[in-house]
Protein backbone atom coordinates (compact mmCIF):
# COMPACT_ATOMS: atom_id res chain seq x y z
CA UNK A 1 0.00 0.00 0.00
CA UNK A 2 1.32 3.44 -0.89
CA UNK A 3 0.05 6.83 0.12
CA UNK A 4 -0.58 9.55 -2.43
CA UNK A 5 -1.64 12.44 -0.19
CA UNK A 6 0.32 12.41 3.06
CA UNK A 7 2.86 15.24 3.28
CA UNK A 8 6.36 15.01 4.69
CA UNK A 9 7.87 17.78 6.72
CA UNK A 10 10.33 18.84 9.33
CA UNK A 11 9.43 19.97 12.81
CA UNK A 12 11.60 21.90 13.35
CA UNK A 13 14.78 22.53 11.36
CA UNK A 14 17.10 25.10 12.97
CA UNK A 15 17.96 26.36 9.49
CA UNK A 16 20.46 28.97 10.69
CA UNK A 17 22.73 26.07 11.67
CA UNK A 18 22.73 24.64 8.13
CA UNK A 19 24.46 25.61 4.92
CA UNK A 20 21.61 26.90 2.76
CA UNK A 21 22.75 25.10 -0.41
CA UNK A 22 22.90 21.78 1.46
CA UNK A 23 19.46 22.35 2.97
CA UNK A 24 17.98 23.31 -0.43
CA UNK A 25 19.51 20.24 -2.06
CA UNK A 26 18.18 17.87 0.63
CA UNK A 27 14.68 19.37 0.56
CA UNK A 28 14.61 19.25 -3.27
CA UNK A 29 15.66 15.59 -3.19
CA UNK A 30 12.90 14.63 -0.74
CA UNK A 31 10.40 16.70 -2.74
CA UNK A 32 11.24 14.77 -5.90
CA UNK A 33 11.21 11.39 -4.12
CA UNK A 34 7.80 12.18 -2.57
CA UNK A 35 6.24 13.48 -5.76
CA UNK A 36 6.03 17.05 -4.47
CA UNK A 37 4.81 16.49 -0.93
CA UNK A 38 7.48 18.00 1.33
CA UNK A 39 7.27 21.06 3.57
CA UNK A 40 10.26 22.67 5.29
CA UNK A 41 9.54 23.76 8.87
CA UNK A 42 12.07 26.22 10.31
CA UNK A 43 12.84 28.18 13.44
CA UNK A 44 15.80 29.61 15.31
CA UNK A 45 16.31 26.39 17.24
CA UNK A 46 16.16 26.04 21.00
CA UNK A 47 19.49 25.99 22.75
CA UNK A 48 20.35 22.95 24.80
CA UNK A 49 23.46 21.08 25.82
CA UNK A 50 23.54 18.93 22.70
CA UNK A 51 23.97 21.97 20.44
CA UNK A 52 26.31 23.79 22.77
CA UNK A 53 28.62 20.77 22.90
CA UNK A 54 29.47 21.38 19.23
CA UNK A 55 29.24 25.12 18.76
CA UNK A 56 29.04 28.31 20.77
CA UNK A 57 25.79 30.21 21.00
CA UNK A 58 25.89 33.14 18.59
CA UNK A 59 22.79 34.67 20.15
CA UNK A 60 19.20 34.96 18.93
CA UNK A 61 19.82 38.08 16.82
CA UNK A 62 22.60 36.41 14.81
CA UNK A 63 20.60 33.20 14.43
CA UNK A 64 17.60 35.25 13.23
CA UNK A 65 19.67 37.07 10.59
CA UNK A 66 21.22 33.78 9.48
CA UNK A 67 17.77 32.18 9.26
CA UNK A 68 16.56 34.99 6.99
CA UNK A 69 19.60 34.55 4.74
CA UNK A 70 19.24 30.75 4.64
CA UNK A 71 15.62 31.14 3.52
CA UNK A 72 16.55 33.73 0.88
CA UNK A 73 19.20 31.39 -0.55
CA UNK A 74 16.85 28.38 -0.30
CA UNK A 75 14.16 30.18 -2.32
CA UNK A 76 16.68 31.51 -4.82
CA UNK A 77 18.36 28.17 -5.45
CA UNK A 78 15.07 26.32 -5.87
CA UNK A 79 13.29 29.08 -7.79
CA UNK A 80 14.20 27.76 -11.25
CA UNK A 81 16.00 30.93 -12.33
CA UNK A 82 19.68 31.89 -12.40
CA UNK A 83 20.56 33.07 -8.91
CA UNK A 84 23.32 34.82 -7.00
CA UNK A 85 23.39 36.13 -3.46
CA UNK A 86 25.58 38.22 -1.21
CA UNK A 87 24.62 38.46 2.44
CA UNK A 88 26.25 39.03 5.79
CA UNK A 89 26.77 35.30 6.43
CA UNK A 90 26.24 33.49 3.12
CA UNK A 91 26.97 34.14 -0.52
CA UNK A 92 26.46 32.29 -3.78
CA UNK A 93 28.16 33.03 -7.07
CA UNK A 94 25.81 32.98 -10.06
CA UNK A 95 24.11 29.57 -10.03
CA UNK A 96 22.25 28.42 -13.13
CA UNK A 97 21.58 24.78 -12.26
CA UNK A 98 21.06 22.99 -8.97
CA UNK A 99 22.17 19.41 -8.48
CA UNK A 100 20.08 17.36 -7.70
CA UNK A 101 17.32 18.28 -10.16
CA UNK A 102 14.84 20.95 -9.07
CA UNK A 103 11.92 20.16 -6.76
CA UNK A 104 8.49 19.21 -8.05
CA UNK A 105 6.74 22.07 -6.22
CA UNK A 106 7.17 25.52 -7.68
CA UNK A 107 8.57 27.94 -7.03
CA UNK A 108 9.92 25.78 -4.16
CA UNK A 109 8.59 23.46 -1.45
CA UNK A 110 6.62 25.51 1.09
CA UNK A 111 8.26 26.91 4.20
CA UNK A 112 6.53 27.06 7.57
CA UNK A 113 8.22 29.31 10.16
CA UNK A 114 7.85 29.62 13.88
CA UNK A 115 5.95 32.83 14.47
CA UNK A 116 6.53 34.01 18.01
CA UNK A 117 4.24 36.76 19.26
CA UNK A 118 5.49 38.72 22.25
CA UNK A 119 2.50 40.37 23.97
CA UNK A 120 2.88 44.13 24.29
CA UNK A 121 5.63 44.44 21.68
CA UNK A 122 4.74 46.53 18.65
CA UNK A 123 7.31 45.03 16.27
CA UNK A 124 7.02 41.26 15.91
CA UNK A 125 10.06 40.21 13.83
CA UNK A 126 9.34 36.51 14.11
CA UNK A 127 5.80 37.08 12.78
CA UNK A 128 7.18 39.30 10.02
CA UNK A 129 9.42 36.43 8.91
CA UNK A 130 6.59 33.89 9.08
CA UNK A 131 4.30 36.18 7.08
CA UNK A 132 6.77 36.17 4.16
CA UNK A 133 6.54 32.40 3.73
CA UNK A 134 3.77 29.81 3.32
CA UNK A 135 2.84 28.93 6.89
CA UNK A 136 3.38 29.45 10.59
CA UNK A 137 3.94 27.40 13.72
CA UNK A 138 2.29 29.81 16.19
CA UNK A 139 3.98 30.50 19.51
CA UNK A 140 3.19 33.00 22.24
CA UNK A 141 5.96 34.19 24.55
CA UNK A 142 5.37 33.57 28.24
CA UNK A 143 4.87 29.82 28.57
CA UNK A 144 6.80 27.79 31.11
CA UNK A 145 9.21 24.88 30.65
CA UNK A 146 6.58 22.56 32.11
CA UNK A 147 3.83 23.93 29.86
CA UNK A 148 5.40 25.80 26.91
CA UNK A 149 2.13 26.26 25.05
CA UNK A 150 0.28 27.64 28.08
CA UNK A 151 -0.02 31.14 26.56
CA UNK A 152 -1.42 29.89 23.23
CA UNK A 153 -5.06 30.49 24.13
CA UNK A 154 -7.79 30.86 21.48
CA UNK A 155 -7.84 34.70 21.87
CA UNK A 156 -4.02 34.86 21.63
CA UNK A 157 -4.04 32.64 18.53
CA UNK A 158 -6.75 34.82 16.98
CA UNK A 159 -4.60 37.93 17.58
CA UNK A 160 -1.53 36.22 16.12
CA UNK A 161 -3.44 35.21 12.96
CA UNK A 162 -4.90 38.73 12.64
CA UNK A 163 -1.40 40.22 12.86
CA UNK A 164 -0.16 37.77 10.24
CA UNK A 165 -3.07 38.73 7.99
CA UNK A 166 -2.21 42.42 8.35
CA UNK A 167 1.48 41.77 7.61
CA UNK A 168 0.61 39.72 4.55
CA UNK A 169 -1.85 42.38 3.35
CA UNK A 170 0.90 45.03 3.65
CA UNK A 171 2.98 42.85 1.30
CA UNK A 172 0.06 42.39 -1.13
CA UNK A 173 -0.61 38.79 -0.06
CA UNK A 174 -3.70 37.14 1.38
CA UNK A 175 -4.16 34.40 3.95
CA UNK A 176 -5.65 32.11 1.29
CA UNK A 177 -3.46 29.01 1.06
CA UNK A 178 -1.44 30.13 4.10
CA UNK A 179 -1.09 27.37 6.70
CA UNK A 180 -1.48 27.93 10.45
CA UNK A 181 -0.22 24.71 12.00
Question: Over which residues does each language-model region extend?
Answer:
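Active-site-adjacent structural elements that line small-molecule/cofactor binding pockets in enzymes
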Residues: 1-181
